[in-house]
């Protein structure tokens, strides 16, 4: 099943957001890409506004996953996690990206343009697209506990 992806970033993540958006649009595993990020490096829209807009689309079922880029990947993760039902993670290595989906069923991947090189970011997104959570896994009960606490 091809994924519907929403992508966003603030001005500190604009360049990577643009490069990764193009990569996503060219990937056969992606049905559509919606960009809710800033329009340029001079656009001062704050990262919480971008992150919440993307996360809300995932929470409403308008997108399967979101990719968020800011300077560190931390602020967008904090903001996205304020949206009920969203599990957003900051990950800058393959293992963490894998576990974010396989163990935590995270729908939102966050990265920092100032923290990770572009080629690694591209490789991580490519890996992320191929991962799918198994609702029968040992981790499913833990994810259900998170959802129950949140009331999602």
Curated annotation (Swiss-Prot):
Pathway: Carbohydrate metabolism; erythritol degradation; Carbohydrate metabolism; D-threitol degradation; Carbohydrate metabolism; L-threitol degradation. Its EC number is 5.3.1.34. It catalyses: D-erythrulose 4-phosphate = D-erythrose 4-phosphate. Keywords: Carbohydrate metabolism, Isomerase. Pfam families: LacAB_rpiB (PF02502). The active site is at residue 70. Gene3D superfamilies: Sugar-phosphate isomerase, RpiB/LacA/LacB. SUPFAM superfamilies: Ribose/Galactose isomerase RpiB/AlsB. InterPro entries: Rib-5-P_Isoase_Actino (IPR011860), RpiB_LacA_LacB (IPR003500), RpiB_LacA_LacB_sf (IPR036569), SPI_LacAB/RpiB (IPR051812). Disruption phenotype: Cells lacking this gene are totally unable to grow on L-threitol. Cells lacking both derI1 and derI2 are totally unable to grow on D-threitol or on erythritol. PANTHER family: RIBOSE 5-PHOSPHATE ISOMERASE, RIBOSE 5-PHOSPHATE ISOMERASE-RELATED. Catalyzes the isomerization of D-erythrulose-4P to D-erythrose-4P. Involved in the degradation pathways of L-threitol, D-threitol and erythritol, that allow M.smegmatis to grow on these compounds as the sole carbon source. This is D-erythrulose-4-phosphate isomerase 2. It comes from Mycolicibacterium smegmatis (strain ATCC 700084 / mc(2)155). The gene is derI2.
């Amino acid at each position: 099943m091809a994924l519907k992806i929403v992508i966003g970033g603030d001005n500190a993540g604009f360049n990577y957001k643009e490069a990764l958006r193009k990569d996503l649009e060219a990937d056969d595993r992606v049905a559509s890409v919606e960009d809710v990020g800033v329009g340029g490096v001079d656009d001062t829209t704050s990262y919480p506004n971008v992150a919440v807009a993307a996360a809300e689309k995932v929470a409403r079922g308008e997108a399967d996953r979101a990719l968020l880029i800011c300077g560190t990947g931390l602020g967008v993760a904090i903001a996205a996690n304020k949206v009920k039902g969203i599990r957003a993670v900051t990950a800058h290595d393959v293992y963490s990206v894998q576990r974010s989906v396989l163990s935590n069923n995270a729908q939102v991947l966050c990265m920092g343009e100032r923290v990770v090189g572009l080629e690694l970011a591209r490789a991580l997104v490519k890996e992320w697209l191929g991962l799918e959570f198994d609702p029968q896994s040992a981790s499913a009960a833990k994810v259900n506990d998170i959802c129950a606490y949140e009331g999602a």
